[in-house]
């Protein structure tokens, strides 16, 4: 009777661990969905990188405010991606730690079950081992796949973020050069206006002098 109670308790504990694994699997699926969304955003950023080349071509024809706004928006998008990347990395580490803890407790429960059932029907033990081993293997495979996807997304995001930062620096330098050219153009225009005004004043003086001479004659 005591042996039967021990087995039932061990089975109940094993079932509870399986339920926790299922809950953990749901959380892992949610994390995979977040990773997929992040990959889509990375693809969108790649497309933006292609579009920014077109922006460089027409930058000279756009107002300064438009260029500054584009740079600010790009910085904000990169910061958001980096923050989301950090949160996903933290979630991945937490899920891996939780999986290791659950696996450890599961092995402990299975060991107790085996020790308590040495004199019982070995077919029960084999059936339990096969059932729970299959379920655990499915969860482990899913977590492993999710971790691989996450690492790839993180590598792509980090690499893309560096390239985008270089693009921003290049755009800022081009913007600075455009402003310098604009300033030089304005100064040249003002100098031309001053010279025109000076020439007009001189011409007006000559006309006035000639007119006075004619009147005296």
UniProtKB/Swiss-Prot annotation:
Transmembrane domains' residue ranges: none
UniProt entry keywords in alphabetical sequence: Coiled coil, Cytoplasm
Protein localization: Cytoplasm
Domain of life according to the entry: Eukaryota
InterPro entries: SIKE
One cellular-component annotation, GO: cytoplasm
One of the GO biological process terms: response to wounding
Keyword Cytoplasm attached: yes
Protein name: FGFR1 oncogene partner 2 homolog
Organism, as annotated: Gallus gallus (Chicken)
The encoding gene: FGFR1OP2
């Amino acid at each position: 009777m005591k042996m039967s109670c021990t087995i039932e308790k061990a089975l109940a504990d094993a079932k509870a661990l399986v339920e926790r694994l299922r809950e953990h699997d749901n959380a892992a699926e949610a994390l995979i969905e977040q990773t997929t969304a992040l990959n889509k955003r990375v693809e969108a950023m790649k497309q933006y990188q292609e579009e920014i080349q077109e922006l460089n071509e027409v930058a000279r024809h756009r107002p300064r405010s438009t260029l500054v706004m584009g740079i600010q928006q790009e910085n904000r998008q990169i910061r958001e991606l980096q923050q989301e990347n950090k949160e996903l990395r933290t979630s991945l580490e937490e899920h891996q730690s939780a999986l290791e803890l659950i696996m450890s407790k599961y092995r402990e429960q299975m060991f107790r079950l085996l020790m308590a059932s040495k004199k019982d029907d070995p077919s029960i033990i084999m059936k339990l081992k096969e059932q729970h081993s299959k379920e655990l293997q499915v969860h482990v495979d899913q977590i492993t796949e999710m971790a691989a996807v996450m690492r790839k997304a993180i590598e792509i995001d980090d690499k893309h973020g560096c390239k985008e930062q270089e693009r921003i620096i290049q755009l800022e330098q081009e913007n600075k050069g455009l402003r310098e050219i604009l300033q030089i153009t304005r100064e040249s225009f003002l100098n031309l206006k001053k010279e025109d005004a000076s020439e007009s004043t001189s011409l007006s003086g000559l006309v006035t002098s000639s007119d006075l001479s004619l009147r005296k004659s």
